[in-house]
Amino acid sequence: YLSYAFPHNHELQLNYTRRINRPRGRQLSAFRNVSDSTNISYGNPNLNPEFANSLELNYIKSWEKHVLSTSIYYKYTTDVIQRVQFQSLENPRVMESTFDNVAKSQALGVELVAKNRLWTWLNLTTTVNLFYQQMGEIVYRDVLLKEASDGFSWTTRLMANFIFGKSFTGQITGSYGSPRVIAQGKTNHFYSLDLGLRKSFLNKTLNLSLTVRDVLNSHSWHTTTWGDTFYQDFERYMYGPHFSLNLTYNFGNMKPKKKPQSNREVNDNMMDEGGEYFE
C-alpha cells in the first residue's frame, strides 16, 4: 500500500491485495436435493478456495463537505467457484447442478465514489462501478462445458444517512446491478432497497436498531444458462421484505469494529449468496 498526499487536498494511492474466498457450507455439502426430480443439485466437498489478486490506483480529492474518489483496478481470480449444470448421464431429461473451481477470470474497471455532507442532518454516499469481465473456458470432469466468455457490467449504490439527533440515526440504501457474465451464461439485472433506524441510550452503551431489507420485494436472482444440449432460466425470490430488531449492550470501552466493504465486494457477496441456492 503506497500513498502520496499533494497540496490542496489531493491524494494518490496504489494498493495491491490478495484475498482468499473460501467455499461456503452449502457449496461443500454433498447432500443431493431431489425436491425437484428434473433438477437435482448438490455441493462439492472437494472445492478449493478462490484466490483474488487486485491492483488498484486511487485518486482522492477532498473539499470541506465533499470527497470524490476515482479508482482504476485490475482483478485476477484463480479457481473461480461457480455453479455448473449438465444433463444427467442416467437420464438426459434430468439436469444436475453442482459447484466446481471452473476457471480463471479477469476484470478491469473504474469505480467512482462521492461522499457529500449536504446538511447537518443528511449525508450521501454514491458509488458507481463499471467493469469489463472475462471468464475462461469452463471445464468440468475433463469435459468442455462452455467456451471463454466476456462482457461489460455496471453497478451503482446510493446510501443516505440521516441524523435526527445525537442518539437517533437512520439509513436508506438502494442498489442496482446490470446483467453479468457467469460460468455458463449470465445473471439478469437486480435492484433492492433497504431501510434502517438506530437509537442509542445510556451514553451509547445500549443500542436499539431496526432493519428492513428488500422493502420493494424486488430481491430476486434470475440466471440464464445454456450448453450444447440445454437452455435454462432460473429465478429465485427472497419473499421479502425482511424485518430484524436488535438490542446490543457495550461493556466498558469495547467498540465493535466492522471492516468496510467496497461496492465491488458488496455486489460480489450478493452474487455468491444467490449462486449457492439449492432449492
Roles of regions detected by a PLM:
Residues H8-H10, E64-L68, T120-T126, W154, ...:
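Outer-envelope beta-barrel architecture signal
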Residues L14-R18, N53, T70-Y76, T126-Y132, ...:
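Transmembrane beta-barrel strands of outer-membrane/channel proteins
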Residues S149-E279:
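Conserved C-terminal beta-signal and adjacent last beta-strands/turns
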Residues L2-Y4, L47, L57-K61, I72, ...:
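Residues on the lipid-exposed face of transmembrane beta-strands in outer-membrane beta-barrel proteins
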Residues Y1-T77, N161, K166-T169, T173:
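Structural signature of Gram-negative outer-membrane beta-barrels, strongest in the C-terminal barrel
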Residues G25-N33, S37-S41, I72, V80-L89, ...:
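Outer-membrane beta-barrel translocator domains and adjoining extracellular loop/strand segments
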Residues Y42-N44, N48, S54, W63, ...:
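Outer membrane beta-barrel strand-and-loop segments of large Gram-negative receptors
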